[in-house]
Amino acid sequence: GGGFILLAGEVGTGKTTVNRCLLEQLPDTTDLAIILNPALSALELLATACDELDIDYPKKTESLKALTDALHQFLLANFEKGRKTVLMIDEAQHLDFDVLEQIRLLTNLETNEEKLLQIILIGQPELTEKLARAELRQLNQRITARYNLQPLNQDETTAYIRHRLEVAGLAGGVSLFDRGAVRQINALTRGIPRLINVLCDRALLGAYGQKRNQVNRSLVRHAANEVFGDARQSDSRGR
């Protein structure tokens, strides 16, 4: 344990879903601090982490050292009880450089055996670019696992749509989207799962309205025009 885990991906590629699955798999012996608003100073971030973990500290302190010491004592006590501590920061691409440096310093909190704090940074691709800058070299070197969520290709889009429909209760082997429709969906959404969900939902509604048993390219184009407007359609035809 310890160090940093990086999860990066464009908006809509499934970071929140992966995050949720990860949280569900954390053992009961884990204490978790989640920071969803990264527009914080270093002091505010440490205070928020302490609040999340129910750590006592002088509430009006302006001292980073006081907050770090309080966190360190908590981490040591947790370690002695056999518990793990995880700090998860979402939208981490918005963190200022001085805040990222303060977060790096938290990974210095360790025993002779191991790091006391596991930090998970979640953000858009700009986060990866930011961490590659020279001034964050030391933090970048402490990342022990990197995951980059990519858009789905056509085969993955087919499998994804099938899976979503089966989870919703559709019998296996039944296809509500013909191949041309799936190709169109992949092109129009650029393989972004969140957009695939929106477009499929609208196309299925259109098929229901026309009493059709299967979605074709025409229905997808019509649905895309309703949810995305004309710009994405013309962009898709030019691809």
Identify the role of each PLM range.
Residues 4, 72-76, 80-121, 134:
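Conserved Walker B catalytic segment
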Residues 23-25, 127-142, 151:
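Short regulatory helix/loop adjacent to the ATP-binding pocket of P-loop NTPases
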Residues 63-72, 84, 160, 173-188:
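Short conserved motifs of the RecA-like P-loop NTPase core
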Residues 29-31, 40-59:
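Conserved NTP-binding/hydrolysis module of P-loop NTPases
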